[in-house]
Amino acid sequence: KDIKPSDIMTREAFQNAIVTASAIGASTNAPPHIIAIAKHLNIKLTLDDWEKWGEEIPLLVNLQPAGDHLGEGFFQAGGVPVVMKELSKQNKINNGAMTVTGKTVADNLANIKKTENEIIKNYEAPMKDKAGFLVLRSNFFDTAIMKMSVVSEEFKKRYLSDSEHPMQFTARAIVFDGPEHYHNEINNPELNIDENCVLIIRGCGPIGYPGSAEVVNMQPPDHLLKKGISALP
């Protein structure tokens, strides 16, 4: 049939990827990588598309770090096909999109059945509502993403619940030049870091740092952790 990758990786397929990634609580690596793949196919895909198609999607999978279970349990519960079946029933994905099986999404999902389990949730009773990636815009970066499926209610209340400016926050920027600087200085009292600060590591993106590695798990300074503040923006 001479089916080529470009026949499968269409804009509709990328839309399906965005919706499915949002529903399973995928890594923040997903948006930049999927956008880069689309670019190689001359398909314009941006964070605006993630915001449009994914932000309102609920979290359907009870997996760590957003939930309790591990990947093996997700596989045994039916995995991604069962999640896509739930999304398909709600008309959230393009059922007519061609796939690597040579069949459409609808064909692939025709015989998929969801069994009752505590790992894959029904769309109407998800782990969390509106759990896709929140696209952030700021005066010191063009765009960034926040994985809402793992954002705690405490964090949301503190930073994203201003009655006049919902889903916005203003904070003092604490800037570190690389992971070593962060580790050496995060507990420096002269920085005067409080709960109204945002932590930034400069120069560790795809251009400034080899491979755009995940170089540090940024936590607040110890004195905030002792107060029960487990995360800063």
Spans of model-derived segments:
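Catalytic or ion-coupling anion/metal-binding cores of large enzyme and transporter domains
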Residues: 1-233
